[in-house]
Design a protein with these regions (language model features):
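Short helix-capping/linker segments at secondary-structure and domain boundaries
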Residues: 2-6, 59-62, 101-105, 151-160, ...
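Short, solvent-exposed positions on alpha-helices
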Residues: 4, 60, 91, 201-202
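Basic, amphipathic alpha-helical segments enriched in Lys/Arg and hydrophobic/aromatic residues
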Residues: 187-228
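Short coil/turn segments at secondary-structure boundaries
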Residues: 5-11, 19-24, 65-66, 125-128, ...
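Phosphate-backbone recognition surface of nucleic-acid-processing proteins
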Residues: 80-90, 94-196, 200
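Glycine-rich, often acidic, oxyanion-interacting loops/wings at catalytic, nucleic-acid
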Residues: 1-81, 168-171, 178
C-alpha cells in the first residue's frame, strides 16, 4: 500500500522515474529523496518514505527470523528439498510444511491438490461437465502456490544461479526430481497458453495444481510415481 501511495504521489506532482526499469532499488530511492519538493509536499513524501523504510526493516527482520526457523533441525531437511523447486522459496516451503504437517495423510498427489481446492469441480452430482477449481480447502496455501506458479509465465529453460545455490547440499536424486518438475511446469504453462489458448489465469492455476502434486511427491518420497 505504501508503495502505491508513493507512486501515486509522485505521479500526481508530475515526476516520473526514468533512470532504470526497476523501482525500489537504491537508485530509485535516492531519486525519491532528492525530488525538488517544498513545504507540505516535501513533508508528505518524507513521511511516506519513513513509513516505507519502517515497513521494509520490519519485513527484513521477519524474513531473517523465518530463515532461522527454517534452519532448525525440525524443518531443515524438508525445507531444503522444497526450495529445489524453481518457484518455491524458504517462506513458501516453511508455510507449506507447517500448515500440512503429515503429508502421508494424503494417499495420492491429487488428494493433496484437492485439499488445496486446486482440482476442477462438477456442475452437479453425476454430471461429468467440469467447472473451474473448487476453491475449497486451505485458502492460504492455495493462494501461495498460485502466486508461486506465476513465475512459470516468465520462466526460461535452464537453471538460474540463485536456484543452483538453493540446491547446493541436496541429494542428486532430489535435484533431478526438482529439475524435471521445473521443466515440466514451464512447458505445461507454455503449452496451455500457446497451443490450447488458455488465458494466463487458467494456465497459472493448472501449473499450481501440478506444483502441488510435485510438492506432495517430494514430501512423501514418491518422487518417481508423480513424474511417471
Amino acid at each position: 500500500v505504501i508503495k502505491q501511495q508513493i507512486c501515486a504521489f509522485t505521479t500526481r506532482h508530475g515526476y516520473k522515474f526514468t533512470d532504470g526499469k526497476n523501482y525500489w532499488t537504491k537508485k530509485h530511492l535516492k531519486w525519491l529523496k532528492e525530488l525538488p519538493l517544498e513545504g507540505v509536499n516535501k513533508e508528505t513524501l518524507d513521511s511516506y518514505l519513513l513509513s516505507y523504510e519502517t515497513v521494509s526493516d520490519r519485513i527484513d527482520q521477519m524474513n531473517k527470523r523465518i530463515e532461522e526457523i527454517a534452519e532448525t533441525d525440525k524443518y531443515r531437511e524438508a525445507v531444503h528439498k522444497l526450495i529445489c523447486l524453481k518457484s518455491v522459496k524458504v517462506l513458501t516451503a516453511l508455510a507449506v510444511i507447517v500448515e500440512i504437517g503429515d503429508f502421508t495423510r494424503f494417499v495420492k498427489a491429487k488428494n493433496f491438490a484437492a485439499f488445496l481446492g486446486l482440482v476442477a469441480g462438477e456442475l452437479s452430482s453425476g454430471d461429468q461437465n467440469q467447472t473451474g477449481i473448487t476453491k475449497q480447502g486451505n485458502t492460504f496455501l492455495r493462494k501461495l502456490l498460485v502466486e508461486c506458479a506465476q513465475s512459470f509465465s516468465r520462466a526460461s529453460s535452464g537453471k538460474s544461479e540463485a536456484l543452483k545455490k538453493r540446491q547446493e547440499g541436496t541429494t542428486p536424486e532430489v535435484i533431478a526430481y526438482a529439475d524435471k518438475a521445473n521443466e515440466r511446469l514451464r512447458k505445461r504453462y507454455m503449452c496451455l497458453v500457446l497451443h490450447n489458448r488458455k488465458n494466463h489465469n487458467k494456465a497459472t492455476v493448472a501449473a499450481a495444481r501440478e506444483l502441488a502434486c510435485f510438492i506432495w511427491g517430494m514430501m512423501t518420497g514418491n518422487i518417481h510415481t508423480v513424474l511417471a
